[in-house]
Amino acid sequence: MNQTNFGFKKIKANEKQSLVNSVFSNVADKYDLMNDLMSFGMHRLWKDEFIRQIPNLNSNILDVASGSGDIALKLAKKAKDRGSNISLTLSDINEEMLRQAKKKSIDLNLFQNLKFTVASAEELPFPDNSFDYYTIAFGIRNVPDINKALKEAYRVLKPMGKFICLEFSKVKESLLQDFYKFYSFNVIPKIGKIITGNKEAYDYLVESIDLFPSQDEFRIMIKEAGFEEINYKNLSGGIVAIHSAYKL
């Protein structure tokens, strides 16, 4: 029987998605606040750097695992300020998270040109060769079958389309690595319990980060999905990395 990890726990592969859904449904209303607290606001700078990887906003963009919509709404605002003709599709398997994204888009008056689709990253309901860019930020490690999700990304991108992924990675500097591990396993779950009442959700978060492949290992996975011109850029000493590749 196929098994996979849910954090450090071994579970049946077909159980992971429902468990991940439960995690994010339980913390959806405090998700943005927790991101600020856990990263000391750094996630905003990481995401700003991430969207700089999309120079042409006159594009059809798919944002997968959109969550509360941070990436898509940053792109929508940038496009609105520039007068660009952007088309943005926000996709997430968790309906409650997409509900948060919709609410934010209305509050910020950025809902124009946005589409919202509840869908799995492993089975996207879009035709082949549909999008100029595929973005996914802090989401791919939560997908039960990452290789399948990467192949779906390749399928829905147009020829010359760009895949861009922002994800937690492996810290390179030993002193920072020691602090980061201590902070992740001893502090973040406690903050999560105080703010959301759900320590287990943040135990899963830090465990899933620890298990995610290294920069070079993930690069190989991207290549095996069919992508070329694969690169990554470490941010904050490798706490996170931006991975990019093209469908040629």
From Swiss-Prot:
Principal EC category: transferase
Residue numbers binding S-adenosyl-L-methionine: S68, D92
Keywords: Menaquinone biosynthesis, Methyltransferase, S-adenosyl-L-methionine, Transferase, Ubiquinone biosynthesis
GO molecular function list: 2-methoxy-6-polyprenyl-1,4-benzoquinol methyltransferase activity; demethylmenaquinone methyltransferase activity
Pfam families: Ubie_methyltran (PF01209)
Catalysis performed (reactions): a 2-demethylmenaquinol + S-adenosyl-L-methionine = a menaquinol + S-adenosyl-L-homocysteine + H(+); a 2-methoxy-6-(all-trans-polyprenyl)benzene-1,4-diol + S-adenosyl-L-methionine = a 5-methoxy-2-methyl-3-(all-trans-polyprenyl)benzene-1,4-diol + S-adenosyl-L-homocysteine + H(+)
Record-listed E.C. numbers: 2.1.1.163, 2.1.1.201
CDD domains: AdoMet_MTases (cd02440)
Associated pathway: Quinol/quinone metabolism; menaquinone biosynthesis; menaquinol from 1,4-dihydroxy-2-naphthoate: step 2/2; Cofactor biosynthesis; ubiquinone biosynthesis
GO biological process, one term: methylation
Described purpose of this protein according to its UniProt entry: Methyltransferase required for the conversion of demethylmenaquinol (DMKH2) to menaquinol (MKH2) and the conversion of 2-polyprenyl-6-methoxy-1,4-benzoquinol (DDMQH2) to 2-polyprenyl-3-methyl-6-methoxy-1,4-benzoquinol (DMQH2).
Alphabetical list of HAMAP family matching this protein: MenG_UbiE_methyltr
Family under the similarity heading: Belongs to the class I-like SAM-binding methyltransferase superfamily. MenG/UbiE family.
Protein name as it appears in the record: Ubiquinone/menaquinone biosynthesis C-methyltransferase UbiE
Taxonomic placement: Bacteria, Pseudomonadati, Pseudomonadota, Alphaproteobacteria, Rickettsiales
